[in-house]
Amino acid sequence: MAKGGFPGGFNINNMIKQAQQMQEEIKKMQEELMQKTVEATVGGGMVKAVANGRKELVSIEINPAVVDKDDVETLEDLVLAAVNQALRNAEEMIASEMAKITGGLNIPGLF
């Protein structure tokens, strides 16, 4: 049996090293995701929401043509749809980046 190992070739020291390396890669990725953005545009380009890789809203752009004081509800719906889609896009971006590091393993609690 190898030093630090278990029957069957399992080596706890190697596993710890791999976990530490993955942790460092995840930290680096989190820093990189802060700089990346995704966007969502709804209403034929009338409302655009931009989110970063921390699922934070960075900006909202509203075309003045969609602003109607007699129909605020439509604008509210468009803003809500754009924000929700931008946040979903951020989730997908994060999942894609995480899969590169974890090899597709779903590790709860990382984000």
Curated annotation (Swiss-Prot):
Keywords: Cytoplasm, DNA-binding. Its main location: cytoplasm. GO terms for molecular function: DNA binding. It comes from the Bacteria. It is found in: Cytoplasm, Nucleoid. One of its GO terms (cellular component) is cytosol. Belongs to the YbaB/EbfC family. Binds to DNA and alters its conformation. May be involved in regulation of gene expression, nucleoid organization and DNA protection. Homodimer. This is Nucleoid-associated protein Teth514_0034.
